[in-house]
Amino acid sequence: INLASLSEAHGEGVRPLHGHFAKLSCIAPLERGASGLQVFTQDWRVTRKIEADLRKLEQEYIIEVRGETTPQALERLARGATRNDRELPKAKASWQNETHLRLALKNPQPGQISELCAYLRLEVRGMRRIRLGGVSMGKLPLGQWRYLASTERF
């Protein structure tokens, strides 16, 4: 994160200062192999708040997959399903297009998104987090960042 990668979409009156880039910590890290929305802060209060609420915050992913599944299997995810005698987390799933699955769930643990896709008999080719709670990436280009708008809340 640096001044050069600040998105042009940012325009809300926060003037970037060099001190804004010191001692940043990443909260709510991405699943291994995923890209997309990450949250960085210097404020310990923000860190504490998000870490305390992380279990309740819904996270939304767009997953590039290969394969086909049934609408009934997608509906089963919303009620909860089991795979290999393990309970899978409840998740809202829908097709964005033929190769991209939209998945929304709370507090995904490492490997759970891949496991949900395996339950659906889909092969994961890539995944991107697009939303964390009430904060969405919107049309933010890859590799760019922006400040949190004053109207946004996790």
Predicted regions located by residue number:
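Basic, flexible Lys/Arg- and Gly-enriched helix-loop patches that mediate nucleic-acid binding at interfaces
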Residues: 1-154
